[in-house]
């Protein structure tokens, strides 16, 4: 009697073929960028355009999380995102693989550009006065605005006790809501390292809050 080979098994093999590994969205994006960067660095304009198309919404969300409303900054999140995309395009011809994903390279540029925006805000303190409205405004009044600015300043000062890498991890994990795997992909490390960095960063923030008597001691 002649039997047919089971369709779940490959020819010449007694074992079924293994299913393709499931990749996260961040892994898929990182892989797509890594595929495009070599072609883009060789001068393919379409690949460069595709990189910007993929990168822009990612860095826009990152800038919005880091800069907030940007009321006291000279640049908005959109402005900084545009700067990041421009710097990324300018860096493509000189890009060399350094053992990390191209996505991690882009987030390195993003962190530097956001830091530049904060530095410029510290150097330039002129805030333009808006025109007076004709109708009563339902927006927050001067007291609410001042309190919100004070809270933002306190948060900014608190975050300065952390290293830049730890700040990046907290922004991505707690503000952007990324998973440890997504954060690891962005900064070029492992999910386990991300969790350790987050744990240490939060412990350092708690310690500083206790020093300032803003957090009660745990029994």
Predicted regions and their residues:
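Intrinsic, short, N-terminal disordered tails of RNA polymerase sigma-factor systems
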Residues: 1-42, 46-61, 65-68, 78, ...
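Glycine-rich, flexible loop segments associated with nucleotide phosphate handling
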Residues: 72-80
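Structural recognition of an alpha-helix C-terminal capping motif at a helix-to-coil junction
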Residues: 79-86, 100-112
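Conserved strand-loop elements at the edges of beta-sheets that form or border functional pockets
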Residues: 53, 97, 108
């Amino acid at each position: 009697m002649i039997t047919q080979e089971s369709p779940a098994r490959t020819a010449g093999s007694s074992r079924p073929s293994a299913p393709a590994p499931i990749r996260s969205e961040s892994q898929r994006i990182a892989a797509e960028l890594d595929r495009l960067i070599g072609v883009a660095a060789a001068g393919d304009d379409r690949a460069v355009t595709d990189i910007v198309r993929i990168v822009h919404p990612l860095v826009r969300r990152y800038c919005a999380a880091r800069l907030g409303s940007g009321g006291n900054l000279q640049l908005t999140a959109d402005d900084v995102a545009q700067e990041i995309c421009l710097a990324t395009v300018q860096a493509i011809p000189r890009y060399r693989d350094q053992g990390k994903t191209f996505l991690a390279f882009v987030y390195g540029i993003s962190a530097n550009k956001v830091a530049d925006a904060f530095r410029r805000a510290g150097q330039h303190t002129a805030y333009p006065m808006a025109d007076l409205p004709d109708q009563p405004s339902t927006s927050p009044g001067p007291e609410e605005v001042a309190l919100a600015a004070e809270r933002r300043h306190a948060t900014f000062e608190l975050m300065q006790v952390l290293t830049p890498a730890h700040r990046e991890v907290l922004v991505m994990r707690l503000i952007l809501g990324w998973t440890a795997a997504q954060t690891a992909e962005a900064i070029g490390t492992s999910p386990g390292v991300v969790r350790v960095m987050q744990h240490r960063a939060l412990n350092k923030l708690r310690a500083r809050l206790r020093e300032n008597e803003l957090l009660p001691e745990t029994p």
